[in-house]
Amino acid sequence: MSDFMTEQEFRIEHDTMGEVKVPAQALWRAQTQRAVENFPISGRGLESAQIRAMGLLKAACAQVNKDSGALDAAKADAIIAAGKEIATGKHDAEFPIDVFQTGSGTSSNMNTNEVIASIAKANGTEVHPNDDVNMGQSSNDTFPTATHVAATEAAVNDLIPGLKVLHESLAKKANEWDSVVKSGRTHLMDAVPVTLGQEFGGYARQIQLGIERIEATLPRLGELAIGGTAVGTGINTSADFGGKVVAELVELTGVTQLQEAANHFEAQANRDALVEFSGAMRVVAVSLYKIANDIRLMGSGPLTGLGEIQLPDLQPGSSIMPGKVNPVLCETATQVSAQVIGNDAAVAFAGSQGQFELNVFIPVMARNVLESARLLANTARVFATRLVDGIVPNEEHMKQLAESSPSIVTPLNSAIGYEAAAKVAKAALAEGKTIRQTVIDMGFVDGEKLTEEELDKRLDVLAMANTDRKQKF
């Protein structure tokens, strides 16, 4: 009985290498099953964004083949419908192949072809995975095309909007806290005063520049290899196939940055645009780490840290210490930064692995790039709405710290000289007195070099921040 049930769980499919047992209910067929058995590596498949792009690409190709008369209209319509259905995410579970597979993505291309053929068959139309679904295509142009479609779509529709949310939150706080004075710090040591708004304005500018860096990659990221087929020559397809497919993809995705590759040999042999895009995301990750770490340090305490700002209480921080609350979103952001930087290292190496007419590290590049975009987009939104928007500054405490910093002696350089000012700073620190009192006690307020009124003016910590010098963020 057990053997009978086991047999019933499978069906027999075949390809050019022979028969293969496939799970009875699976939409995939022989070539996909071989890949599943060959690559039990990580348990991680393609990103959903890539599966979506593969579905849309097959639909676009079928439409062009239908319009040219190369593909029967009924078959084309069945492929188009199935491809669009895949793009909704409904069939993501039918893409079981590990990301660590053949480096061209051939296995995943055939996975897509087979699933589309099975969906079409279930809806009453027989189509062949190779002859019909893959008409005018090769894995060598479809898989990189889908990768670039997914990456461009992720950048335009998710990553850039997510970063704009974070930029807006930081910029709002920069304006709100423009006059909230605090001690500046360099080398983690006391420095001359700044305002909390100036610091957050710097953070906002970092994110804005990150957005601009990502946007700058789009003209190259959006170049698509489709039409080059096996090696870039376009064998087995028409000269206008690639351009027409790209036009369909623009229509299907709404992403106007998509365009046919200017040189199909470059577009298949190299993945430089993915390396560039990943590098731009790495810069954002570096910025995000710095911002999150600064905020974490400013919020440290509540009693034995800097305690300059209060972070939102999001969840209990300890299973043993009652009442403890931790900067969990800062820690999330810094971990995401580490992952994105690591992903970029793999992408950079993988990008170097193009021998002659084809890069053969595309699946891992696609997975890492799309994961990085997703992680940064999600983190940016959550970091903005659940952390930055809820920060409360401890204004009086920050002002006290700023006024007690030895570095506020700096504006006295032009009145009493650098060496004398240094003596004041050291004496104030050693004796536990304010800079103002120390200057007076050391006899520098003599009515000639320095009056008491001039001293107070020079020691105005907010004035030291030069908030009238507006900065762009």
Curated annotation (Swiss-Prot):
Residues of the site described as Important for catalytic activity: E331
Pfam families on file: FumaraseC_C (PF10415), Lyase_1 (PF00206)
Active site, renumbered: H187, S318
Record's subcellular location: Cytoplasm
A GO cellular-component term linked to this record: cytoplasm
PROSITE patterns hit by this protein: FUMARATE_LYASES
A GO MF term: fumarate hydratase activity
Keywords: Cytoplasm, Lyase, Tricarboxylic acid cycle
Top-level taxonomic group: Bacteria
Residues passing through the membrane, by range: none
Assigned EC number: 4.2.1.2
Pathway: Carbohydrate metabolism; tricarboxylic acid cycle; (S)-malate from fumarate: step 1/1
Catalyzed reactions per annotation: (S)-malate = fumarate + H2O
Statement: the UniProt record of this protein carries the keyword Nucleus: no
Biological process, per Gene Ontology: fumarate metabolic process; tricarboxylic acid cycle
UniProt keyword Lyase, yes or no: yes
Function of the protein: Involved in the TCA cycle. Catalyzes the stereospecific interconversion of fumarate to L-malate.
Subunit structure: Homotetramer.
Extra remark: There are 2 substrate-binding sites: the catalytic A site, and the non-catalytic B site that may play a role in the transfer of substrate or product between the active site and the solvent. Alternatively, the B site may bind allosteric effectors.
Family affiliation: Belongs to the class-II fumarase/aspartase family. Fumarase subfamily.
Protein known as: Fumarate hydratase class II
